[in-house]
Structure formats: C-alpha cells, structure tokens
Amino acid sequence: MKDREHTEKRILEAVGSIIENDGFEKIGVNAIAQRAGVSKMLIYRYFGGIDELIAQYLLQKDYW
C-alpha cells in the first residue's frame, strides 16, 4: 500500500472512530486530524474539505 493510500485510510478510519465514539456532531477537521495524526492541511489536500471527506467515508462504507 502506498503512503498516500495508507494515510487516506487512517483519515477515513478516524472519521469512523469519531462517529462511533463521539457522535456525528463532533466531526470536524481538527478532531479528525488529531485522531488520524495528520495535519489539517493534509486533509484539505487529499479530500478538499470536510464535506468531501464525509462523502468519501460514506461511499467507502456503502451507506447509500
């Protein structure tokens, strides 16, 4: 697995962890970055923002 793929996976796992443990209302770039151990800038670079990140998480989990 490439570094970027590994990092994206960690970020998406952080989203899931926050939803499961803290609730959807606690989702934010700061919380996700801290949980994933990455910078906020990296999240914006990889996903464009919180909306795209949540959309990617939901697609990955096949919620739709």
Residues of each region from the PLM?
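Intrinsically disordered, low-complexity segments enriched in small/polar residues
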Residues: D22, L42-Y44, A55
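Alpha-helical DNA-contacting segments of helix-turn-helix folds
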Residues: E52-K61
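Short hydrophobic/aromatic patch on the recognition helix
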Residues: G37-F47
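Basic, helix-initiating cap at the start of DNA-binding domains
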Residues: M1-D22, K26-V38, E52
